[in-house]
Amino acid sequence: MSVLPDPEDTETKALHDYADFSGKRVLEIGCGDGRLTWRYADRAASIVAIDPDADDIATALEDCPNDLRDKIEFRTQRFEELDIPTEKFDLALLSWSL
C-alpha cells in the first residue's frame, strides 16, 4: 500500500494529541512496515506490533532504528491468533486495520 507523504507530520501530531504513550505497554494491530510505530516508540515503555503480512514485518525489522530495537517486538501474526493475558497492554492502536 502506498502512503501519501505527510510533510507537516499531521498524523504524528494527532496521534500524540489523542493518546499518551509515555511509559505505556502498547499493542499495535496492523503495524505494516512500522511507518507509524517509529512515531511513538520513543515514548512507549514497550511495543508488540503485529501484522499478518510477513513482507511488511520483514521491512519493519530491517528499518527499525537501532535505539528502538529493545522495546519493539514485531510479529507476523493476525489479531485473532494473539493470546492476550489480562491487562498485559495499557493501550491498543489500530491504524488502517479492518
State the predicted function of each range.
Residues E80-L91:
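A short acidic, Gly/Pro-enriched loop at the edge of an enzyme's catalytic core
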Residues K24, A45, D90:
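Conserved acidic residues
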Residues P5-K24:
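Conserved alpha-helix/loop element of class I SAM-dependent methyltransferases that forms part
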Residues D33-L82:
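Class I SAM-dependent methyltransferase SAM/SAH-binding core
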Residues K24-G32:
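Conserved class I S-adenosyl-L-methionine
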Residues D90-L98:
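A short SAM/SAH-binding and catalytic strip from SAM-dependent methyltransferases
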Residues D20-F21, A41, T86:
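A short, aliphatic-rich alpha-helical micro-motif
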